[in-house]
């Protein structure tokens, strides 16, 4: 049995989509228990494997992260994180304030001893449909080569345990594929990655080929990773709007759009990274999953499923035994 703590109040569409996702999750997974934190006036579920706990406060999207965690002690996010810290829950899921959740993860759940800096990881789509693991996408704006090596080690574990990939291929995001390309960070990182024979490091990868499906894990610093992630999100939205405008521009195109409707829907599904769940803060003493702030019920459900798999696979213990202890 896996037990998850969930923030009912976080996100643009909370609590409705959270309640819908939680209801579906406990119906689909008979080995899942949930502790739900939020406002009792907005709670309307009744299930033997859902325990509800009232919280008098809520962390807003515009709140300053660290201050909110310190001052709003009875918020749904803080209480959720405390449940993981105490060992009462195996992991947690929230669609709330990203900075506050990372602060709660770092200061409440706690960092694994030996992990220099936790990394935020997300699974992004590829043209072949298999996707790839991408980190860091914003936990740390600055990074040293040693941090990128550790990100690769964390990503390697994540790809194996969560995505079921044996001996995943690890790549370093760079401006060229040649070993000597890049700045001092990527050059030194390349050397360290190449020297770690526990990793299947296959070299540099350029941003233009990220979605080709040639690798399983891509490592970069949080500043670059966050910009790449937002660029991909924006590009996907722009392409979708351009396609819609083109289809609606003439009767001929509308007919073609109707014929291709099923294929276009399948394409949209393949490119929707909410299918893979949320982003995960790796390197902590518990599983912390960040669902997108604008998540619908399907996306939040995927994040719950992702946290459940992490609990089943005991990913935190694996990180302690490999990345943590090896760096003490």
UniProtKB/Swiss-Prot annotation:
> One cellular component GO annotation, for this chain's record?
cytoplasm
Answer whether the UniProt record assigns the keyword Lipid metabolism to this protein: yes
Biological pathway = Lipid metabolism; phospholipid metabolism
Q: Which reaction does it catalyse?
A: a fatty acyl-[ACP] + phosphate = an acyl phosphate + holo-[ACP]
Query: Which is one GO molecular function term here?
Result: phosphate:acyl-[acyl carrier protein] acyltransferase activity
Q: Where in the cell is it found?
A: Cytoplasm
| Enzyme Commission number, as recorded | 2.3.1.274
Transmembrane intervals: none
Q: Which UniProt keywords apply?
A: Cytoplasm, Lipid biosynthesis, Lipid metabolism, Phospholipid biosynthesis, Phospholipid metabolism, Transferase
Question: Does the keyword field hold Membrane?
Answer: no
Grouped into one coarse class, the protein's main location is: cytoplasm
The record lists its disulfide bonds as none
A biological process (GO) annotation for this entry? fatty acid biosynthetic process
Provide the assembly information.
Answer: Homodimer. Probably interacts with PlsY.
- What does this protein's UniProt record list under function? Catalyzes the reversible formation of acyl-phosphate (acyl-PO(4)) from acyl-[acyl-carrier-protein] (acyl-ACP). This enzyme utilizes acyl-ACP as fatty acyl donor, but not acyl-CoA.
Q: Which NCBIfam families match?
A: plsX
By sequence similarity, the record places it as follows: Belongs to the PlsX family.
Indicate what this protein is called per its UniProt record. Answer: Phosphate acyltransferase
Species source reads Staphylococcus aureus (strain MRSA252)
């Amino acid at each position: 049995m896996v037990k998850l703590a969930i923030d009912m109040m976080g996100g643009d569409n909370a609590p409705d989509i959270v309640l819908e996702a939680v209801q579906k999750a406990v119906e689909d997974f008979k080995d899942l228990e949930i502790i739900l934190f939020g406002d009792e006036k907005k709670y309307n579920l009744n299930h033997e494997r859902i325990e509800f706990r009232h919280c008098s406060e809520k962390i807003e999207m515009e709140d300053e992260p660290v201050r909110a965690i310190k001052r709003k002690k009875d918020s749904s996010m803080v209480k959720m994180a405390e449940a993981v810290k105490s060992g009462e829950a195996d992991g947690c899921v929230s669609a709330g304030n990203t900075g506050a959740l990372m602060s709660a993860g770092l200061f409440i759940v706690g960092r694994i001893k030996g992990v220099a800096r936790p990394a935020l990881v997300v699974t992004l789509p590829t043209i072949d449909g298999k996707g790839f693991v991408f980190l860091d996408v914003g936990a740390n704006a600055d990074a040293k080569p040693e941090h990128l090596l550790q990100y690769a080690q964390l990503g390697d574990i994540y790809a194996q345990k969560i995505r079921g990939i044996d001996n995943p291929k690890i790549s370093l995001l760079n401006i060229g594929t040649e070993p000597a390309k890049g700045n001092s960070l990527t050059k030194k990182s390349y050397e360290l990655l190449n020297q770690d024979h526990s990793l299947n490091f296959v070299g540099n990868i350029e941003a233009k080929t990220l979605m080709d499906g040639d690798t399983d894990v891509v490592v970069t610093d949080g500043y670059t990773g966050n910009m790449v992630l937002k660029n991909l999100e924006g590009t996907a939205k722009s392409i979708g709007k351009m396609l819609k405008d083109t289809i609606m521009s003439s009767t001929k195109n509308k007919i073609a759009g109707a014929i291709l409707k099923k294929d276009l829907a399948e394409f949209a599904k393949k490119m929707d990274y909410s299918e893979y769940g949320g982003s995960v803060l790796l390197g902590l003493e518990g599983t912390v999953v960040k669902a997108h702030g604008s998540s619908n019920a399907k996306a939040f459900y995927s994040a719950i499923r992702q946290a459940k798999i992490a609990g089943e696979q005991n990913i935190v213990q694996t990180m302690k035994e490999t990345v943590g202890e090896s760096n003490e």
